[in-house]
Amino acid sequence: MINDDLIVLLEPIIKNMGYELWGCEYLSQGKHSLLRIYIDKPDGIGIDDCQEVSKQVSAMLDVEDPIPGHYSLEISSPGIPRPLFSIWQYQRYLGYEIHVKTFKPVNGKRKLSGIIVSASGDTIVLDINNEHQEILLSNIVKANLTV
């Protein structure tokens, strides 16, 4: 999971460039770890946008060095199916269906699909087969909008 300190470092740079920091993933794969940063803007993201942000973020990461060890940096659009990281993103997509993978089982399942009914504090509520299910954000490994 990405440290909040990294978000604090990245967000002002990305925002000043006219983009929204959608989220980050750090995938530790032995010697070949990956830091993936998702950016967005109202009219969409293209390759040139990713390259521009990559140059600025890479320079900042080289100076600040917030992540130990070697890793590759990838700048990407959230795309489809859009990953969800923060409570405000769940709030933005109230009424949409999502797929969720959890650390600990919820009603015996670690993979769930449902409609976002509410999102506040540290909890989201999904409508799964007409039953409301609360899920703590801290229990979510990954969540994506359904295509």
Swiss-Prot record:
GO terms for cellular component: cytosol. Coiled coil: none annotated. It comes from the Bacteria. It holds the Pfam family RimP_N. It is found in: Cytoplasm. Keywords: Cytoplasm, Ribosome biogenesis. GO terms for biological process: ribosomal small subunit assembly; translation. InterPro entries: Ribosome_maturation_RimP, RimP_C, RimP_C_sf, RimP_N, RimP_N_sf. Gene3D superfamilies: Ribosome maturation factor RimP, C-terminal domain (2.30.30.180), RimP-like superfamily, N-terminal (3.30.300.70). Required for maturation of 30S ribosomal subunits. Belongs to the RimP family. This is Ribosome maturation factor RimP. It comes from Legionella pneumophila (strain Lens).
